Amino acid sequence: MARHLPLILLPFVLSCASPARAATTADAEELYRAKRYVEAQTAFEQVIAAEPTNANAAYHLGELAVMRGAPEEAVKWLESAPALVPKSARYFHELGDAYGLSAEKAGLFSKLGLARKCETAYAQAVALDPEDVEARYALFTYYRQAPAIAGGGLEKARAQALEIRKRDEVRGTLALAELSVAEHKFDEAFATLDDLRRRHPESLAASYQFGRAAAMCGQRLDQGAAALRQYLTATPDENQPPLWAAHWRLGQILEKMGDKPGARVEYAAALKLNPTQPQLLEAAQRLK
């Protein structure tokens, strides 16, 4: 019958006769690994529509929502994933990230409850897989940053840093250096980082943390600038500080050294990578 239709209509007829195949979990994961996130979102939505109890699809939809900065959607999906698979440390870790994002964006009266949920999710991830360094580092960061009323505390953070060091010497030592900086013990931080960089010159994260400490305290500025420039020659992975942060810290160092034109260049580079970060906007405005 189609042969009697105008040729221009044939593609339409054929497309109706052969509907597109719905995405599978494997299709969606392949798109995600390729960082084709918009397509991955659509694919995982197709998977969850066909399989409402697919915990892996729910997890990835929540992870994508975290990446987009959409806390309500992230929490919805990431609460459902561990409900379906309650023994997954990975699911609880990402749920903690979703609660943390929600706490950042929540009103004053909701922040504390969401922060506590964040801590609980991270702690559950660590309990399920004590060897998971990333989950421990998330819990370490929570304890380092959160106020005591929300369960935070530097001694709790130190305990996690020591546990991390048992499993990953570089990562754990970096965490201890971060604690020294948080306590404004900069000489101690520099000593720790000097030793780490001497023993592990390949550690880009150590270079970043050295530069960050220099930017914060105003000491060893030349070395701090060199360390950050070294970091900026690389492509950090998702578990390392983003490049915009390195540009920002380098800008702070150059500003302290009196090189305002150089600082402007670094702040502009940071803003190009992260145009909504308040600290960057303030720094760029200050040096106009």
Task: Name these PLM-found stretches.
Residues 29, 63, 97, 104, ...:
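Residue-level recognition of tetratricopeptide repeat
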Residues 57, 91, 135, 172-174, ...:
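TPR alpha-solenoid repeat register
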Residues 60-63, 94, 138, 175, ...:
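Canonical tetratricopeptide repeat
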